[in-house]
Amino acid sequence: MNDEQRVRYLGLALRIFGIFLFVGVYPLMNWLWPAGWAWEPRQTEYEQMIAGIYATLGVFLFLAARNPLEHRSLIQFTIWSSVVHGAIMAAQATHDHGERANLIGDVPALFALALVLWVLLPRKAAR
């Protein structure tokens, strides 16, 4: 895949992930699959905060899709913060048997998001 194709698919991925983060995280945490997307003990304030942060990131990823190469730092931040967040949660879920469902829920979702963006982001900035 050449860089032009990567950027086109990257724009599509940013739109899809942006919409998912904006409208999908809160319902997954609260109604659709809390076992795989929420953590115990349930803390409403924390859940609202994390859903708000991801909804905001979703808006900015969606906007970045217009011209992904102008938003490399946002995309790189999304990649690395998702890897770090996913790794921490994976370690916690591995240690805490009550959180094992997260190993097939939010943890792989973060790693998948990071992987897709990493694969599609051209390695060097266009000049």
Predicted regions and their residues:
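Cytosolic juxtamembrane helix and N-cap/initiation of the first transmembrane helix
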Residues: 1-19
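A loop-to-helix transmembrane entry motif
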Residues: 13-14, 38-54, 102
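Membrane-interface helix termini and inter-helical loops of multi-pass transporters
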Residues: 31-42, 93, 97-98
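Individual transmembrane alpha-helices with interfacial aromatic-anchor signatures
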Residues: 50, 99-113
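Membrane-water interface at the C-terminal end of transmembrane alpha helices
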Residues: 111-127
